[in-house]
Amino acid sequence: SAWMTADIYRDGYHYHLDFKKGENVGGLQKEAYKGRRTGSIIHWKPDDEVFTDIDVPGSYYKDTLRRQAVVNAGLTLNFTDEKEKDPATGKAWHESWCYEHGIADYVAEVAGQDTLTPVFSCESEAVGRDREDQPDYKVLMSAAFCFSNKVQMLEYYHNSSWLEHGGSPEHAVRTAFVYQINKYLKDKNLYKKGESTISFQDVQDCLVYVSSSFSTRTSYENQTKKAITNK
């Protein structure tokens, strides 16, 4: 950043820090604070010597904040864009997001009311390792989905980040849905003679699915961190 300021309210104190070109200016300032406020306020400006274009569109922030609200249930995130005016009020554009039940509410929002099934959600915790020579790590997993003949969507998140290219969560979803639906059709003798078994493409066409996981160790597919390889 070209410059950054940080104001932190915690444990009865107000802390303030100034930075310029990555270096602290003036040291840490600390003063007693008698209010009830807690949290952090960060102001910063991208450095145009580092970034070729610092005019980041509002749509980028909106999409990022919305996704963060989805995977952090009950958290309200607000966005005010002083460059864009609200045509109804003439004031700065303001938007907020909050999904009280996280990904389950998000799936319901995307799918709408006319769905083939209700939204199903589940959550689980586990401890495991990816290889025998690696240490154990904890993982918290949650998923929500429904079926619709009008909307199709698959999204995966890990440690609050959107996995644009999926990785192991996507592979797991493909395997699980195909296996379970195929088993059901076979057990109920619903396949016609000579009919091909179901593929994930058949499932995907009507599936609205979102998963969110958190782990204490993460293995990324590459440096873009848009896919994970955790087993």
Predicted segments with their positions:
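GHKL-type ATPase core
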Residues: S1-E109
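GHKL/Histidine-kinase-like ATPase module
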Residues: S59, R66-Q68, G74-K225
